[in-house]
Amino acid sequence: MKIKTRFAPSPTGYLHVGGARTALYSWLFSRHLGGEFVLRIEDTDLERSTQEAIDAIMDGMNWLNLDWDEGPYFQTKRFDRYNAVIDQMLDAGTAYRCYCSKERLEALREAQMANGEKPRYDGHCRDSQCTHGADEPSVVRFRNPQEGSVIFDDKIRGPIEFSNQELDDLIIRRTDGSPTYNFCVVIDDWDMEITHVIRGEDHINNTPRQINILKALGAPVPEYAHVSMILGDDGKKLSKRHGAVGVMQYRDDGYLPEALLNYLVRLGWSHGDQEIFSIEEMTQLFTLDAVSKSASAFNTEKLQWLNHHYINSLPPEQVAVHLSWHVEQLGIDTRNGPELVEIVKLLGERCKTLKEMAESCRYFYEEFDAFDVDAAKKHLRPVARQPLEAVKVKLAAITEWTTENVHNAIQGTADELGVGMGKVGMPLRVAVTGVGQSPGMDVTVHAIGQARTLARIDKALAFISEREAQQ
């Protein structure tokens, strides 16, 4: 049997982390077993579905490198197919027209709730012989079995049973002629030959209804696996107030797709005590029986830890491609400065995100307007004039601009003055970067370049002179 899974988001908002994890699990399951992965856009909610949301879903999937073998399919383009099946069901008696007014249904609901009953349709039109005008508005309902149970073996949770008496007759076509979500899903899974439906636990209650429709159509029933929800650190369902945002916001905030994928796969799935997984390892190891039934709590610090790991473990050339986007967003012109690969090597250990790295690399490419106040107050004092003037002479004398020669110039200055490296290095750091923290001075000065370094030392010396004049 060819394994076939699907990811079927509704385009009513961005692709959030819960949806991305579901997509990842479905993708991994199919890839692990050599199957196919389908992308389907469930856009039957015409009022809430937007092109912007569709674009956000596609962008998120592409950024995460979760490729699909079929699709994207759009439910709104398949209405003729859905309605054709509904008409067949009406002819076969597995569906019927319901003419109950909104007022009657609302009164029924209120009465049931007043009696402590679960609100459900009472089957008023199910076996009715009453006649109605051809133009009288009606919905179409599925004739759900009234006896027995629906039992399915959830591949994460085990056997789940629903009594058919608890299920009312589901509306499958609205008065405006549009098919409903639960029905469209069934026909899509049937037509697309989906073998395994992996989705969030909020769909568990939809499953028995969908199984009954499939059986009424004589269609094969796929396997189902329902993934537990993601919680915030306060134990409540993850939402915007926890910082939960769309997948592309994580891109904007400087996270690598490899880090987010690694984090999401571990948010409910495990393989021993292993924390770090490449996409190849995930594909090789992923199974549904290792997915937890319990909810998982989202931990931003853990994601940052993973991101820092991948910034420093992936090939610098690969990280630099992602960094270039962030640098462009800040309007930094990198043509007059080191290659971004060098920035990744220099700043990787110091930065948890690429956004932080982009913001920290400005001094390699741009002149700064002012020195950091605290750093200048501490290190650009009159006592720093001598080491700055001395190191400038040695740096200016370098004919081959290498990291080693830069290091020797700084070390040689300290040795000649009989002071520690910090007495030379710290004023030099503030002079050439404008801030009090940076990578080692030899690699930093080398990357900034000889001419720019000398000019910045002159600027720092002028700053010291102005400071002396004001005292």
Swiss-Prot record:
**InterPro entries, per database record:** aa-tRNA-synth_I_cd-bd, aa-tRNA-synth_I_codon-bd_sub2, aa-tRNA-synth_I_CS, aa_tRNA-synth_I_cd-bd_sf, Glu-tRNA-ligase_bac/mito, Glu/Gln-tRNA-synth, Glu/Gln-tRNA-synth_Ib_cat-dom, GluQ/Sye
For this protein, what reaction is catalysed? tRNA(Glu) + L-glutamate + ATP = L-glutamyl-tRNA(Glu) + AMP + diphosphate
CDD domains in alphabetical order: GluRS_core
This enzyme's EC code(s): 6.1.1.17
Which residue ranges does UniProt annotate as crossing the membrane?
Answer: none
Compartment list: Cytoplasm
Function text = Catalyzes the attachment of glutamate to tRNA(Glu) in a two-step reaction: glutamate is first activated by ATP to form Glu-AMP and then transferred to the acceptor end of tRNA(Glu).
- Name the PANTHER family on file: GLUTAMATE--TRNA LIGASE, GLUTAMATE--TRNA LIGASE, MITOCHONDRIAL-RELATED
Q: Give the family this protein belongs to, as stated in its UniProt record.
A: Belongs to the class-I aminoacyl-tRNA synthetase family. Glutamate--tRNA ligase type 1 subfamily.
Q: What is this protein called?
A: Glutamate--tRNA ligase
Protein encoded by which gene: gltX
